[in-house]
C-alpha cells in the first residue's frame, strides 16, 4: 500500500504543478472523498517527465483499486482508452475494479495538454471551480466488466452530478470545455451530456445569475403579440371612455339648465293671507225657502203658498193672545183695565165655546214686549195673583 501511494503521488504531483487546480472538487460535496492527487495537477512541462511512471502502470493488476478516470475509444474516433488509477482504498472506500486498459501517450499529449494549460491559466485569475479535466466526461462506465465496477462507476457518477452551489463558486473563465480540439467531448453518454450542458449554463453566465429553463424560454419566444395588450390600445380605450363620460355630463347639464329656465319662467302666485278669518256665508234663494216651508205644512194638504202663509199668520196671532192673557195678572200698571176687558171678553167666549181650553193648543210663547214690565216688578207679585186670578184652572 505504501508503494502504491508513492506511485500515485509521483504521478499526481511529480512536477509540483496542479492538475485540476480547484479549491473544491466538483465530484462530491465533501473535499475528503478525493485522493490527494486532486490537489495537484500535471502541467504540460511535467507531463513528459511522468511518461515512464505511466508506462510502468499500464494495467490495473490490483483488484482493490478502482478505475477513476477512463476514456474509451469509439469506432469513429479510432483512438485508444485512457485509464487512471487512484487509490480510494486508502480513503476507506472498498471499491474494486477488474478492468485493464492501456495509456495512449499521443491522446494525452493532444487533448490533455491543451486543457491543462488553460486550467493553469485560470488559476492566475483565481477562478478554478469548473475546470476542463474535472468534467464528467472522464468517467465512462462502458469499460467495466464486472458488477462491482458498474456499481462503483454509478456511485461516482452521482458525485459528478451538478448540485446547487453559491454564485461565487461559478467560474466564468472555464471556456476550455467548448474548445473544438476536445473532439471526445461530443461522444459521451447522454447522462454526461446533460451534466455538460448544466456546467456550460453556469460557466457562461457572467453575472452569476441562475440559468433559465429552455422550455420556459421557448414558451416566451413562441408567444404571439396578440396575447399582450399594447399601450396605444389602452390609451385609445381610455380616450373613448373619457369622451363618452364628457358627452353624458354635457347632456345632463343641458337638461338641468332647461329645467331651471322653465321654473324661472313660471312666476309664483303672490297670495297675501288675510288677517281676519274667512267665514263661509250660505246663500239661499227664495225658491229654496218656499220649498222648505211647503215641506213643513205638507201634511195639512195645502200646497198653496198664500194659504200656508195665512195659516201661519193666524197661528201667530193666537199665540200672541194667549201670552197676553197669561201675563196680565202679573202686571200692575194698567193691569186692572186690561184684565177686566179680557175677562169680560173671555167670559163671553167661554159661554160660546165651553169646550175651548188653552191647554189644547200646545206650548204658550210669551212675547218680548210683555217681559220687560214683569222683570221690573218684585218677585212676590208673581206668586200672589190679584183679582181675577181664580178664573184660571
UniProtKB/Swiss-Prot annotation:
Residues 270-319 form the bHLH domain. GO terms for molecular function: DNA-binding transcription factor activity; protein dimerization activity; RNA polymerase II cis-regulatory region sequence-specific DNA binding; sequence-specific DNA binding. Residues 248-277, 332-356 are annotated as: Disordered. One of its GO terms (cellular component) is nucleus. Residues 254-265 have a biased composition (Basic and acidic residues). Gene3D superfamilies: Helix-loop-helix DNA-binding domain. Its main location: nucleus. GO terms for biological process: cellular response to abscisic acid stimulus; cellular response to salt stress; cellular response to water deprivation; positive regulation of DNA-templated transcription; regulation of proline metabolic process; regulation of reactive oxygen species metabolic process. It is found in: Nucleus. Pfam families: HLH. Keywords: DNA-binding, Nucleus, Transcription, Transcription regulation. CDD domains: bHLH_AtbHLH_like. It comes from the Eukaryota. Residues 332-347 have a biased composition (Low complexity). SUPFAM superfamilies: HLH, helix-loop-helix DNA-binding domain (SSF47459). InterPro entries: bHLH95_bHLH, bHLH_dom, HLH_DNA-bd_sf, IND-like. PROSITE patterns: BHLH. Homodimer. This is Transcription factor bHLH112.
